[in-house]
Amino acid sequence: MTNLTRFSVAPLHTMTRRLADVASGRVAPDLVITGARVLSTYSERILRDRELWITGGRVAAVKPAGAHKALPSGFTIYDAAGGIIAPGLVDPHIHIESSMVTACAYAEAALLNGTTTIFCDSHEIGNVMDTAGVEAMLEDARQAPLSIFLTVPSTVPATSAALETAGGDLTPDKIAGLFDRWPEAVALGEKMDFVPVCMGDERSHAILAAALQRGRPVSGHVYGREFVAAYAASGVTDTHEAIDRDIADDLLDAGVWIFLRGGPPTTPWHSLPQAIRTITELGASHKRTAVCTDDRDADDLMLFGLDWVVREAVKAGMSPEQAWSMGSLHGATRFAMDGEIGGLGGGRRADLVLLDDGLKPQSTWYGGELVVDQGKITSLLDQALSQRYQYPKAAYATVKLPAQMKLTPELPAKACTVNAIKTALPGITLIHEKVAIKPANDWDTLFARHGLCFVAVIERHGKSAGNVAHGLLKDFGLKRGAVASSVGHDSHNIIVAGTNEADMQTAVAAIGAQQGGVCVVADGKVRAMVPLPIAGLLSDKRVTAVAEEVKLLKKEWAEAGCTIPYMGFNLIPLSVIPEIRITDKGLVLVPQMELAPLFE
């Protein structure tokens, strides 16, 4: 069987004579793709009547149609039948864990959608298992049929131990060690704590130094024009959060790459049309922009890959050639890999996609091997996907729950003010709403009148004696039962919301029994469950199986009445995004970085 990993193609310096011989026509290539139009990401043109000569998993040359007729015999021909051949897509910013599958399983969906290289920030598993989790995912990535590079998690935990309990703590020394041990650790992941960075926080700048002194670029995550100058001066050279025209202008002029994030319409990350308009209305060059996916669940990963983002960019005003370049060459260039990926120049990896006129991938080659043929995975890829990395035993034992816990608060019998968390689409920003309560008859009536339900966060790393924090959600819309998840960003404690204690207990118990997952419960029964036994974040199944589980989860989630999708629900504990959050330590007022009581 062909070794189908990033390492299956020999380094360029070992192949230059062979490539030159093939490009000159002295030696036959392994593969000739004929009858093609070639999308050049270098000139942003579609070159008609071309063919590609491929050898050893690399592009030897792009030639005029019919040039292969003068070659020595012994090569395979693939007829593109007039389709467009383009370089494989390069996603410059993703979190594999958001898809709830392993790196190997992720590869199947990526290749079906024409993505052949990704740059992954694995801070989710780092928050649970520290460096052991990051390195387990790197081992997984090395065996995957996909080129996966690491942007080392930079902000683990997202905030301080005073505000939440995380399973991991990636110190500057640990981050330096990851860079030194893993050549595929090519950059520092998104530095989310931009305020401490701009204020000169010692730990934050020690982490930046660990990357910069090794010549690694630094990825960012920033809101607010007032922070751009200090952030850029600290060495940050990309961000995926800029959708406002003014801050985008400032970032581009400060030399910061902008990754335009394209999320499906039903998710908190649906901002691409606005982001594209921001760039086009500025009249700015798109050469320092790329597109990325950031977060996708397994279902959306199958339907809304980076290819979908590229097509959405075209709808928003980019030319097809510009959009595909933003999805391939630009991401490669940002990480100084444009000599290897992102285009079809001689010597580049033969990571190719056959497109129809609507830029929909039909077939994919990875390192010169056909892995998707007319929308179906080949037997070669199927075999590679079946040889999955086995995560260590510790990864299957990360949910440590207290023997007993109360998931609903004691409700006051007298008038009070509730510090409620008001949810609203798209679900990223949560509003701090003070609700005045004057108990008259019973709390059930008051809950209905004010649109309230219970929420709790349970520490699950075994570090804080099973902390349980209580809160109340407003306008979450839950009509019955409970919903729960072990993917409570970023520390990934368990978050549960419900209308009653019993169903909330059932939901948390179901997650504990599976060592992680996302579930919907009603009338004491689990109606839908996506088990996530690896670090409480990942399934051990193929992506197609997980996608089906997620579809059922979404159906039951909607029927329960929830007004924000489950991925938005998972963000409720994320204590770095305004205005109010709940962690295992309690309610967090984000602007003040302080804890607040539930009742006043």
UniProtKB/Swiss-Prot annotation:
The gene is ade2. One of its GO terms (molecular function) is adenine deaminase activity. It comes from the Bacteria. It comes from Bradyrhizobium sp. (strain ORS 278). This is Adenine deaminase 2. The lineage of its organism: Bacteria, Pseudomonadati, Pseudomonadota, Alphaproteobacteria, Hyphomicrobiales. PANTHER family: ADENINE DEAMINASE, N-ACETYLGLUCOSAMINE-6-PHOSPHATE DEACETYLASE. Pfam families: Adenine_deam_C, Amidohydro_1. Transmembrane segments: none annotated. It catalyses: adenine + H2O + H(+) = hypoxanthine + NH4(+).
